[in-house]
Amino acid sequence: MANAADFRRIALSFEGAGEYPHFDRRAFKARVTFATLAPDELSANIKFAPEEQVPKCAVAPDAFAALENAWGRRGWTCATLAALSEAELKAALEMAWRHAAPKAKPRRL
């Protein structure tokens, strides 16, 4: 069972990740925001690609639910931390971070 401390530790372990205020939440960004932690620290919103969101929500509906708004249609997904193992949380955050990570600069020849 994961908690907010696990979430924060894992999210900040990715290269280039930082924690920033975001309205009433805490945002975790690399190049762009890939996750936010709720004020009560019981849930988090994680940014998947829409094609990644559907199977996540179907396989683990107790852990993942698409946000019921335009952000949800873009892949933002609510994760209930207590319903996730630490390994599941890490896999979800890594998936989101990969989309937000700084792009490698092209090498000059």
Question: What is each of the regions a protein language model found here?
Answer:
Residues 1-109:
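Charge-dense, helix-prone N-terminal extensions
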